[in-house]
């Protein structure tokens, strides 16, 4: 049984990639996925590298209570610089571009048609507290799926 994606796509026009059980924030992953969808793979790589460097911020549209305002976001105010999730998305995009190149496509020029982050569980952990107690300190696990499609010249 292979890995299933949440969308059905034509393998003659698309390339796919997936991250499995990556330790990163699900909320950050959702916001990054929303922001890079519709961009070309090359544009998304440039954007994520700028996020990691602190030059561009990711708009936080749903999980934004207490999030500071950024002046580099068009049409929105709240944003952050999620470095760990951005690095994971860079790995995913590199994998997707390499898969596309292997299939005979021009990977950098393909458009991100579908990207989705799914919370799949937690890695249990504990944090020691006073008087011999311990509190749960779990780490979230996220699956991210990516579908790249060739640009239509219509």
Curated annotation (Swiss-Prot):
Keyword DNA-binding: no
Pfam families: Ribosomal_L22
CDD domains named in the record: Ribosomal_L22 (cd00336)
GO biological process terms held by the UniProt record: cytoplasmic translation
Family, as annotated: Belongs to the universal ribosomal protein uL22 family.
Function: This protein binds specifically to 23S rRNA. It makes multiple contacts with different domains of the 23S rRNA in the assembled 50S subunit and ribosome. The globular domain of the protein is located near the polypeptide exit tunnel on the outside of the subunit, while an extended beta-hairpin is found that lines the wall of the exit tunnel in the center of the 70S ribosome.
Assembly and interaction partners: Part of the 50S ribosomal subunit.
Protein name (record): Large ribosomal subunit protein uL22
Protein source organism: Natronomonas pharaonis (strain ATCC 35678 / DSM 2160 / CIP 103997 / JCM 8858 / NBRC 14720 / NCIMB 2260 / Gabara)
Name of the encoding gene: rpl22
